[in-house]
Regions:
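Glycine-rich phosphate-binding active-site loops on the catalytic face of alpha/beta enzymes
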Residues: 72-81, 113-126, 144
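Short flexible/disordered coil segments
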Residues: 87-91, 114-119, 133
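Conserved N-terminal beta1-alpha1 strand-loop-helix module at the mouth
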Residues: 1-78, 83-110, 138-139
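Broad hydrophobic/π-residue packing in well-ordered secondary structure
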Residues: 37, 68, 111, 118, ...
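Glycine-rich adenosine-cofactor-binding loop
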Residues: 94-95, 126-145
Length: 145
């Protein structure tokens, strides 16, 4: 079973603490994307044996030959469906409700992060609602705190 670790910046010590089954996802919406930084993280993850995904930019993930991309819940775009990607390219998405789940299915993601299970924010689902929603799709689900 894979684990997922979201990062906002490159900090080797955080990646070093992860095992090889942990997929690293770079997600920082507060700054412009620095391709050089992305390549640095990619190369470090490769050296450590971790897969590396970037958030909300499938085109760049393909261009930089990353392991995949993560599509956040607010992204409804389906342009990437026309892109040619290798078979092992991973596309993950996140959702908070049935509408967003259906959008992620139409975006043809490999798995859906469903959040949040615990009462931390306005998108709180709880365990029972998580179970109910996860029965509505054949896609694999990943519970987010």
């Amino acid at each position: 079973m894979n684990r997922y670790y979201f990062i906002k910046k490159f900090d080797q010590s955080h990646i070093d603490k992860q095992d090889k089954k942990t997929i690293i996802i770079f997600r920082n919406y507060n700054q412009d994307i620095d391709e050089k930084l992305i390549l640095t993280i990619k190369n470090y993850c490769k050296k450590k044996g971790n897969k590396f995904l970037i958030s909300n930019n499938i085109k760049l993930a393909i261009k930089l030959n990353l392991d995949g991309a993560y599509i956040p819940s607010f992204n409804k775009d389906k342009k990437h469906l026309s892109y040619s990607v290798r078979k092992s390219f991973i596309i993950l998405g996140s959702a908070h409700n049935v509408y967003e789940m259906r959008t992620k299915e139409l975006q043809n993601v490999n798995a859906i992060f469903l959040s949040s299970i615990f009462k931390k924010n306005k998108n709180y689902l709880g365990i029972n609602k998580f179970k109910s929603l996860s029965l509505l799709s054949n896609k694999p689900f990943i519970a987010l705190g």
